[in-house]
Amino acid sequence: MVPYLTMEKYGRIDSVLIHVGGPPKGDLLDIPEEDWDKANDMVLKPVIRMAKLVTPIMEKQGGGSIVNITTFSAFEPSLTFPTSSVYRVGVSSFTKLYSDRYGPANIRMNCLLPGFTDSLDLPQKFADMSSLKRLARAEEQAKVAAFLLSDDSSYMTGQSLRVDGGVTRHM
C-alpha cells in the first residue's frame, strides 16, 4: 500500500490527493445495478479507504490535509454523468463529516471541483460553457490543489471549492 511505502521512505504523510477515474455512464434507469456498484467502488469507496489508512498516521503526527478531486457538477447533477453525479456528491458529504470528526486532530479534508480541463480532448462547446470561454489549464487546477494541501489553507476544511471558470455561476 502506498501509505506504508511512503511512511517507510519519508517517515510521515502530510498531505494526500485523491483523484479517481470516471465511472460508467448511461441513461439513468438503464444503468445496470452492477455499474452503480462499480461507480461506488470507483468514486466513493477509495476516499473512505484512503482516509482509513492515513488518518491514524496523521493523528499521530499532529495533523495533515486530504484533498478529494471530484467535479464541478457534484452539486448540480448531470444526466450525461448520472453515476458520477450521485457518488461525487457523496464524496462531498463524506468530506464534511470527516472534517467535523477529525478537525479537532488538525486533519483537514476538502474537495476540489474542477471544470472542464484542457487535458481532456473536448469539443469547443465545453469551453463555451465557461464565462472565460476556454477550458481550464491542468496547471491551474494543480495550483488550487497545492493550495488546499498546503498550510496556506490551514483554516479551510469541509469545503468543496469550484474551479470551473464560471460554468456553475448560475446554479
Where are the regions a protein language model picked out?
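Substrate-binding pocket helix/loop in short-chain dehydrogenase/reductase
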Residues: 27-28, 35-40, 126
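Active-site loop of short-chain dehydrogenase/reductase
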Residues: 12-14, 58-70, 104-107, 159
